[in-house]
Amino acid sequence: MRRIALIAALAALTATPAFAQNFTGNWACRDATTAKAGILTIYGEVYGFASTTANDGSSGTGTITGYQDGVSFNDGNLRTGKAIQAGRIIPDPTYGTAIQLETAEAIVMLCTPR
């Protein structure tokens, strides 16, 4: 009976997608001109963004939904101020991984680990 319970528990754990392991932490973001845009911090289901521009409306906090290949921005200043909907994990030749921040129309920022 214990073996069946152990096997069932292990199967349930391996079937669930990994959450927040690959995108959690601090990310240095650059805009389309490669100028420094700010710092993105993701922990759990929340994010914070600090813009390099004073009084920028995109600075602030909000909530996210994590996926295997990135995050969805549910609310907060990045969503309302910059219309950013998603952050996708992509391979990066220098840092290994990066997050590209996207609106519905375009990629607007690239963030690399700090």
Predicted features along the sequence, with ranges:
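Conserved, charge-rich beta-strand/loop surface module that forms ligand/interface-binding patches
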Residues: A8, F73-N74
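Bacterial N-terminal signal peptides
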Residues: I7-A15
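Sec/Tat signal peptide C-region and signal peptidase I cleavage site
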Residues: T16-A20
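Positively charged n-region of N-terminal signal peptides that target proteins for export
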Residues: M1-I4
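Edge beta-strand at a domain terminus
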Residues: S59-Y67, G96-R114
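Short, solvent-exposed coil/turn segments at beta-strand boundaries
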Residues: L40-A50, Y67-G70, R88-A98, R114
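Acidic surface patches and DE-rich sequence motifs
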Residues: D31, A54, Y67, F73, ...
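Short, solvent-exposed loop/hinge segments that bridge or flank secondary-structure elements
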Residues: N22-T53, D75-G87, E105-A106, L110
